[in-house]
């Protein structure tokens, strides 16, 4: 969020530090606020019947007549026919964006939203769809429309994890949230407090027996971490650090050390997130939120002892909401069924950008694996066992649990052989195309695949999007692969829930990274046939990158509250027709973060010149401590920063902060807060700046660095200064970057060089090193924020959340 909270009371001008320019923040007018209010209310508790009388009356019809649309195509006709025949996916059924029939229907519904001539037509169709069409399909189509309609710039929906929390939190938490009853909660004890013995008394046998049974319920077994039984020393167990709350303690199980149970408790304090201090000192924000009853519940990540494997220790990362949301929104921005010409996606080099993101996400995942002593991502094969099983422990909103995969699962044995032949046939075909270096289309046209820009063609093929050449063949392979993983038949309509069928859930599964590694390998296979960069190509005459000083790199686990109010099942409260949002539910979870860091460049230049400065992060050693050669290691580097700068003649000292990174975002403003801001502005009490929340397309800033080690994990950074090569449109010149992602604008990228340059091609180390490059050895330290609580005698506030803990780590880790 790029504004100060004080701006809510008056319009101002802010400085966008990342881009070194002053930017006027736009403020919403009444018409905009009416639209924003509608979007927030129409997805409120989307699985439940619509309760807003205004929208119920509005949604009594759906405009199927062509005159209400700027374009009317075959998908819209087919959708209308399916609606008349009652052949649409029913409400309450699982929706999979990568299920063939679901995707076709979703495309038809999206077109009705996207091509609506005016807001009234759009709003009427949305209200009707909310009441009568499948919930998952509705949100999918609506999200695409809000992102891609040119006249919707600045309008937002709640984050996907706030619309459908069920896709991001385990079934135990979801069931507790959905059965939350405020009246019952008021009548019962606020806490079922499970205290440690605060006064350090030796327990009686009965108290020991109670604790022992609870320990069994938590699955802790009968032994200590030292192998000693509770029976032998139950009288002194409270005097040691081996109390059951610490027995199976992991960093993200913080509530055990505070004596809190996994149930709802109420706090009048502020919502936790990393930028909350911008708000909780502001009187307007405090006034706005004072009447909201806030309830919190600790939530864990999934760790299934029955399907335990080495990937289980990474669940805090693979199940991170920001990590999964990034992939979801990338595939909303560049949806496989949106053509590049109509939506302008070709202006953004959509195929290359999608494929480069696959590579970058795999690089980031690989670095997290190294933090835990794990090595390369395992190779994927359709004809070998998948060693790593996975149980997502998710439950769909219709009550059906997600399917799971056992360890050493054989894809070939349990699959549909016809589908498998088509999938493997595609993979073999594209590998042959890359090796041959050309492709002959059905009309006999020859396409040269030995040019660098041909990576766009390869990317479109691998994503299976509609811009792929011969898209009848290439478009469906990607969808078929995901359907095969989910054991879903080609013509199946009602599908069992599976994480691999939706973008927002698939990154939870270790198999995702194995499969997408096979996709990235085609990218590297293509690059193998391009000539290596020569010293002359890499050299920037007159520019020397003399030194880079990097500040301390520290990661830690912090706490955050995610808004899960959409899972409430109680009665909605209305006053004079106006909805009263009087209570909110929050999932309190521990997640990976890092201390802000910076680096300072010392660059000598022989002349004034506009340049682009790039920064990469990568491993230095493999899991066995062996140094990785640059030739092999180039594939493991992740680009963390790029920006333009005008060098002056002589020495240039440039300081760059992690908070300046253009591609990352902080925590998004919660659904509850956004709705209150909208209503207050609608009533004329506040101004509503359009940059009120972070753009949806940003990568989580807190996940830039891998976890690292307590003693320090050796890594390396690479920096390079290159001449500025202008893209088709200057970056951010055609859209407002403070609230828009500029999808299809052609102005998203800093220059026209290939993504990942200079690591995109294979390296000749004799030619590679030039004065405008700089390698820097760095160390990433992991700080244990819960360490002070390990000795229970130092903590006396059991059964309550310790807000001083949040203050302490905020001060310690967020200040440079």
UniProtKB/Swiss-Prot annotation:
Give the transmembrane region(s).
Answer: none
Specify the domain of life of the species encoding this protein.
Eukaryota
Q: Name the Gene3D superfamilies on file.
A: Di-copper center containing domain from catechol oxidase, Hemocyanin, C-terminal domain, Hemocyanin, N-terminal domain
Q: Which GO terms describe its biological process?
A: energy homeostasis
Q: Where is the signal peptide?
A: 1-16
Keyword Signal found:
yes
Under PROSITE patterns, the record lists:
HEMOCYANIN_2 (PS00210)
One GO cellular component assignment for this chain's record is:
extracellular space
User: Molecular function terms in GO for this entry?
Assistant: nutrient reservoir activity
The UniProt entry lists the main location of this chain as secreted
Q: Which family does it belong to?
A: Belongs to the hemocyanin family.
Role of this protein = Larval storage protein (LSP) which may serve as a store of amino acids for synthesis of adult proteins.
The protein's matches in PANTHER family, at most eight in alphabetical order, are given as: FAT-BODY PROTEIN 1-RELATED, LARVAL STORAGE PROTEIN/PHENOLOXIDASE
Q: How does it assemble?
A: Heterohexamer, composed of three subunits, alpha, beta and gamma.
- Name under which the protein is recorded: Larval serum protein 1 alpha chain
